[in-house]
Amino acid sequence: LTMRSIYMDYYNQLNKIEGNASRYVPVYELYDSNRSFEPLVQNYFEQYLGQFPAQVFDKINENFIRCSFYELVSRYLSHCYTFAIEQNNSVGRSDFEMIGIPGTDYYTDDRVVEFKYYRSKDADRMLALTEPLVEHVEQVKGYAADTKRKFPNYHVRSYIVYICANKGWKCWEV
């Protein structure tokens, strides 16, 4: 157990956020066959964040998004990935990284994710975008390039995820 997981468990209990596996397991079972990252984000937004009352979304922040996504994904994919939050590298800190475990079919699969959280007042503007902001693309591509330099045999994929309060989400592979 880490302090982060203890905090998230406490937060979920305090706010009666349901951790019922039936909300999540089908998506993670499907991930085993298609390895598509976007449905993980969709499931997180709809099934986890969807339980929160609207007023919470003006109080949470990017750190909460990053930590709660980590807590959920690591619960169901820790048999095939290791996870890092705020992973240090030569160009900064990536928000979230999942690295395939040696000896599994996931070995050399690396996903680098940059999360951006927007409150209600900015949500519609961000949801109208057809592509992520250039500075976010440059940021996550820098993290991915650094990982690729360190681990040249890895297949590194990078993503930008916008969580726009309780109004919606966007996920791009860049």
Residue ranges of model-derived segments:
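Nucleic-acid nuclease catalytic cores
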Residues: 128-174
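Extended alpha-helical interface modules used as scaffolds for assembling large macromolecular complexes
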Residues: 1-126, 131-136, 144
